[in-house]
Amino acid sequence: RYDHPGDAIYAPLLLKQLSDRKPADCVVTTDVGQHQMWAAQHIAHTRPENFITSSGLGTMGFGLPAAVGAQVARPNDTVVCISGDGSFMMNVQELGTVKRKQLPLKIVLLDNQRLGMVRQWQQLFFQERYSETTLTDNPDFLMLASAFGIPGQHITRKDQVEAALDTMLNSEGPYLLHVSIDELENVWPLVPPGASNSEMLEKLS
């Protein structure tokens, strides 16, 4: 399930490694997209209120302000926001709130330089007619975080993951872990449009 060839970072495995390392009382928030699906599939929780997501509402940009609220409400618990490069840019200004309030929340930014879920649907259901899903002109996310006084790290290889997660979780203040992942990685299983849960696609045929 977590076997993946090559040196590239495999998002499901990274999130499983995060799940194994995070404190039992850790709160995880997500934005919307492939990272949201992977987080729901591969991060375990001890209580239902420890996973905060907008589910099927599709509210990109939800994850960071949700993490801010969770950290204010539970100042003694670890809060981790799982985001994607598309969603993160929707409410990136909330890094100002993180700095102003000195909130020690952590951000795992899974960056495939795509609107990944939209790209996957265009691949599977629209004959690979890709439109407005490429984000190769993303900003330098570490420089952006640094402008708000938030430290971070950028990783690109699977052998960097464990040490990077440990550094993030052990940091005293806010922290951004920028993770480059394969732009063509898909989420499985997937329910096609108009289908039922008994008609899930297990992989690309």
Q: For the regions a protein language model found, what residue spans apply to each?
A:
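Conserved thiamine diphosphate
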Residues: 73-164
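Short gly/pro/ser/thr-enriched loop/turn and capping motifs at secondary-structure boundaries
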Residues: 36-37, 58-60, 88-89, 113-117, ...
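Active-site diphosphate/adenylate-binding microenvironment
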Residues: 1-65, 70
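Short acidic, glycine/serine/threonine-rich loops at helix termini
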Residues: 39-44, 63-65, 92-94, 117-122, ...
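Glycine/aspartate-rich loop-and-adjacent alpha/beta segment that forms the canonical ThDP
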Residues: 143, 158-205
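Short glycine/proline- and charge-enriched loop/turn segments
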Residues: 45-50, 121-129, 197-198
